[in-house]
């Protein structure tokens, strides 16, 4: 799966995140992660942390 800037993704933890930086395609990204308590945490995620890309529009 190809991940692009600002894609919304579902993480394997069940959280959603927006990609804000691509460090290396298919390897690592910086993401704004929507936490269960309503906060947003910016963190580095691996491609293997991503369950699927969420399509916002066609």
Go through each PLM region and give its residues.
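Basic/aromatic-rich interaction segments and small domains that mediate binding to polyanionic partners
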Residues: 2-51, 56-57
């Amino acid at each position: 799966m190809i991940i692009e800037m600002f894609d919304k993704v579902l993480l394997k933890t069940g959280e959603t995140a927006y990609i804000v930086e691509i460090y290396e395609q298919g390897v690592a990204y910086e993401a704004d992660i929507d936490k269960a308590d309503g906060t947003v945490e910016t963190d580095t995620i691996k491609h293997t942390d991503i369950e699927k890309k969420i399509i916002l529009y066609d």
